[in-house]
Amino acid sequence: MSGTIAVAPDKRWSAAGWLFEWAVEALAEDLDDDAAVASLREIVDDNLGWLGLDDLSPAVRAEVLRRIRTELVDRADRELPPTLPNRSEAVDLLRDLSRLAENA
């Protein structure tokens, strides 16, 4: 299974399901919008495999994009176990997501 984050209608990032779920959970953590947190957790809990950032409110979308650009890769470097198979490739995929978010 895989998952996709639509950063914009023409900018999509896909990854293995576990990495998609890790990213969505990380993005949901500590958001100020309870409804957005519930929606993001539902995506993971129900194995929906899709997060469209345009479906979020403008304020939440801006915050999620900021986190993708500035926090997600560093967090992966800290949290993903060094023994994780293909760890460097997973972090590189998150870098790709960060680059997509730069101009969104």
Regions found by a protein language model. Name each.
Residues 1-103:
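Acidic (Asp/Glu-rich) sequence patches and key acidic residues
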